[in-house]
């Protein structure tokens, strides 16, 4: 397990009974988490002082119950020094806040790899969401192409870049279907030194294209291999579904990339430390190929 344990503005205070108790800056939220299957006694007194609680609906989706008036959005910081990012938090109708805090452990890893490369690095970030990985790579000196199917989410990423003082960095923000974009990049002969993908379990592209992770991921990894440069630095695949284990993702990277590039592969769960118990809640997995 690789815990994202360097946060100051985010904290997983406690977790039990299918819910997380979280601090986002000064704001306390309760959100459901299907991984939290245990029903231990609540350890934190802040359960009773949450500012907002997300309630799932039996029909899908859900809604927020606000116990005090909150701003529509606010900012939190991640990292320090040259790697410091400022990210905009905003509770959405699907329980998300615009930040997956467990990914901070990967953001720091990408930044270290890019800084250590000692050469110009081009990164492709697929399913880039609100841009945490994109900004971490850009802050470390990379040129980044950020692709996501949601126009609103890409706009959120641009706002995060401005908040982080990175609006002038070489970042292309694209609203596109990721698989179609990679196919076009192959035809154009464009290549990248690093590829990051954070695919959803299920989704739709801007043209109604259907994405189902288990059915589509291997083909996309294979396509991405063809847009890697001759001297690639890394390739990272994230998954949030229990239907795709870390070892399966690593196997796909190993069989797709190692025959051509050599290098090594690894995989692990990523998670968030729980302040009340000292445990770590799993929040998905990452498989990595690196030179």
Task: For each feature predicted by the language model, list its residue ranges.
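Conserved alpha-helix/loop element of class I SAM-dependent methyltransferases that forms part
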Residues: 101-119
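S-adenosyl-L-methionine
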Residues: 150-196
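Non-catalytic substrate-recognition/targeting regions of SAM-dependent transferases
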Residues: 8-22, 29-101, 108
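Conserved SAM-binding loop of SAM-dependent methyltransferases across substrates and taxa
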Residues: 130-144
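C-terminal catalytic and target-recognition region of SAM-dependent MTase-like enzymes
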Residues: 232-291
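Short beta->alpha hinge that forms the Motif I/post-I loop of the SAM-binding pocket
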Residues: 128, 148-152, 216
């Amino acid at each position: 397990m690789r815990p994202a344990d360097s946060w100051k503005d985010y904290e997983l205070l406690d977790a039990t009974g299918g819910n997380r108790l979280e601090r986002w800056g000064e704001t306390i939220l309760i959100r459901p988490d299907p991984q939290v299957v245990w029903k231990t006694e609540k350890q934190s007194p802040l359960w009773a002082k949450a500012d907002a609680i997300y309630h799932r609906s039996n029909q899908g989706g859900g809604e927020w119950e606000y116990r005090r008036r909150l701003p529509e959005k606010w900012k939190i910081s991640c990292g320090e020094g040259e790697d410091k990012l400022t990210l905009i938090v905003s509770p959405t109708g699907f329980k998300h806040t615009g930040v997956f805090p467990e990914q901070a452990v990967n953001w720091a890893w990408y930044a270290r790899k890019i800084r250590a490369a000692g050469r110009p690095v081009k990164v492709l970030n697929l399913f880039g969401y609100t841009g945490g990985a994109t900004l971490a790579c850009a802050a470390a000196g990379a040129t980044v192409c950020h692709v996501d199917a949601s126009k609103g989410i890409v706009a959120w990423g641009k706002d995060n870049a401005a908040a982080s003082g990175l609006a002038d960095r070489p970042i292309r923000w694209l609203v596109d279907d990721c698989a179609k974009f990679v196919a076009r990049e192959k035809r154009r002969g464009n290549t990248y030194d690093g590829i990051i993908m954070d695919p959803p379990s299920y989704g739709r592209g801007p043209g109604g294209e259907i994405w189902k992770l288990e059915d589509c991921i291997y083909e996309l990894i294979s396509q991405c291999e063809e847009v890697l440069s001759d001297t690639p630095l890394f390739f990272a695949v994230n998954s949030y579904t229990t239907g795709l284990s870390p070892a399966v993702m690593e196997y796909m990277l190993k069989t797709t990339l190692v025959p051509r590039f050599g290098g090594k592969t690894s995989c692990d769960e990523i998670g968030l430390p729980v302040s009340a118990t000292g445990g770590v809640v799993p929040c998905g997995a990452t498989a990595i190929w690196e030179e």
